[in-house]
């Protein structure tokens, strides 16, 4: 055993001094230090309403962020006391007002409804929809309750909307989920290819780290995006491709790299399978055809290939622009194929690196937090995987269903079909974030019984809930989170939760106990201690970690098997090029270009894409309550190219109506060359609480990748026309 005494002392659960924690927003996973409102010799720090607030600063000792922090992280403490749900509330009908009730009554009603639903609908009449905002302990207890004890795999999360295509792609190509690269590779790469990610706004601290080096020279940046985002503005090469043409582009780059001879033949022969199949596919993507499919110039394609081929080490980053597509898995595997072609994986400065959107989406993947997964990167369809988990959980063989559960959108379809009788939503806001949101809202309204477990009240989803459960949130509960580079951080509680709010895992465990199962955990550390044993021997082995070790030694990357020594050095996967398939070989996974599910036509001639802004987060449940961020981004808008603005007689700031086959919205126009002709952009953060007719997802459709189940939120066909009033942007 290693000696923990050389590390920092254990941090107590409730702090009277500076506390170390993790930012609860994006997947970069920045370390934060929270300073109490009252300090000796200083006036108490208060917000505009006079409430004492903790001051937030970057943790310089955190290996992932090195003391940097963005506006969201810096202001997060301003949101924790506003509009909180403090007590359980119930109403028998959606037409009734909520009434405050006790926890005993709330849990009795919840458990009675679960049992009644099982009797009336069967086990699969129950659905649970969670979130990448969960801590790992929350995720794990939910999996044990739903998939183990209740016997249904109908547990999905909002990670289905952002990361499931990356999960599928890694699994297909490398044999398992898990990004092989780390943040240090940004410091080492000679060429960085960013596909479908506005990293500068959506993962700003990570981009700032690379940008410092990029300014010094010696590394080239290629950005693939239909918009000229702040990320693309500083690129050495911006490829403004047609929405949905990523597979064609990546296949075309493969054609060029192969013709240039940038092929590692020994590696391909000894460490991979499927190369000949890939070669047969990319033969259909010579430069001229690729240019036609993508809308790019042949010269741009050749330059991109030259920049990659001339790099000794090249790294790729991707995010929602790749994943949120009917070809999400195909796009990601097409990118991984290029790394296999060039042996740029498992080595410093290279690798295919997906950026998670949420702070613990990675932890959710490790714990099995999607409808087809089990803890430890296992799958419900694998008999041995089910048996492994049943044994660890002390359940009879056959307790876990072999049938993958309903994905997020399939839950909506289940409500429409009358097949779902009980829906439990936690830490997310599907009444804004799901595609075709008006249809989703209508389905939610049909739910016989919906539980909403959240820290805030109201949210847009409150409208569709019967039972509200108050949840403790960031700063109020202790637990762990895993960021995009597989680094696990202990997030210590340093504030008391308001009212009667409870940690999510405690709520799940109490429901399990009331239903007759053993959920006897003394604290979150005990939950984590059980969970990490489920990962022993798996690619995501965390069995050597504990809350105590993380508190004393600081954040650690996995794999971290039992007996491993703590370190701040970076870890990569597949360093010996032995991949997670049984034979140790990676797989080329080629696909043909298909385009978007809903291409533009005469009636709907434009393509709408949606995305994030720098300051806001998801549906504004937190950031909408922070003055500084609202001043930074006061309203929704639509970006339109000057050519299209002239065509439709639209001027800067004018109100416009955008319509799709599903709905419409009204936005002020922002006329800019940052968007490609024929394409519109609307930010996705505004729901009914924050604007009138500004829901981006009223326009989007639910067509999804057939492999990952991730909806194509990034492209739908729309029409636009000028309205009468004007706005100030």
Swiss-Prot record:
CC terms in the record's Gene Ontology section: membrane
Cofactor, free-text remark: Binds 1 [4Fe-4S] cluster. Binds 1 molybdenum-bis(molybdopterin guanine dinucleotide) (Mo-bis-MGD) cofactor per subunit.
Signal peptide (residue range): none
InterPro entries referenced in this protein's UniProt entry, alphabetically: Asp_de-COase-like_dom_sf (IPR009010), CT_Nitrate-R-NapA-like (IPR041957), MoPterin_dinucl-bd_dom (IPR006657), Mopterin_OxRdtase (IPR006656), Mopterin_OxRdtase_4Fe-4S_dom (IPR006963), Mopterin_OxRdtase_prok_CS (IPR006655), MopterinOxRdtase_cofactor_BS (IPR027467), Prok_molybdopt-oxidoreductase (IPR050123)
UniProt-listed PROSITE patterns: 4FE4S_MOW_BIS_MGD (PS51669), MOLYBDOPTERIN_PROK_1 (PS00551), MOLYBDOPTERIN_PROK_3 (PS00932)
Catalysed reaction equations from the record: nitrate + a quinol = a quinone + nitrite + H2O
Gene Ontology process terms (BP): denitrification pathway; nitrate assimilation
Enzyme class, UniProt record, top EC level: oxidoreductase
Metabolic or biological pathway: Nitrogen metabolism; nitrate reduction (denitrification); dinitrogen from nitrate: step 1/4
Keywords: 4Fe-4S, Iron, Iron-sulfur, Metal-binding, Molybdenum, Nitrate assimilation, Oxidoreductase
CDD domains (alphabetical): MopB_CT_Nitrate-R-NapA-like (cd02791), MopB_Nitrate-R-NapA-like (cd02754)
Pfam families per record: Molybdop_Fe4S4, Molybdopterin, Molydop_binding
Cofactor(s) annotated in UniProt: [4Fe-4S] cluster; Mo-bis(molybdopterin guanine dinucleotide)
Domain 4Fe-4S Mo/W bis-MGD-type: 16-84
Family (UniProt): Belongs to the prokaryotic molybdopterin-containing oxidoreductase family. NasA/NapA/NarB subfamily.
Biological role: Nitrate reductase is a key enzyme involved in the first step of nitrate assimilation in plants, fungi and bacteria.
Protein name according to UniProt: Nitrate reductase
Species in which this protein is naturally found: Synechococcus elongatus (strain ATCC 33912 / PCC 7942 / FACHB-805)
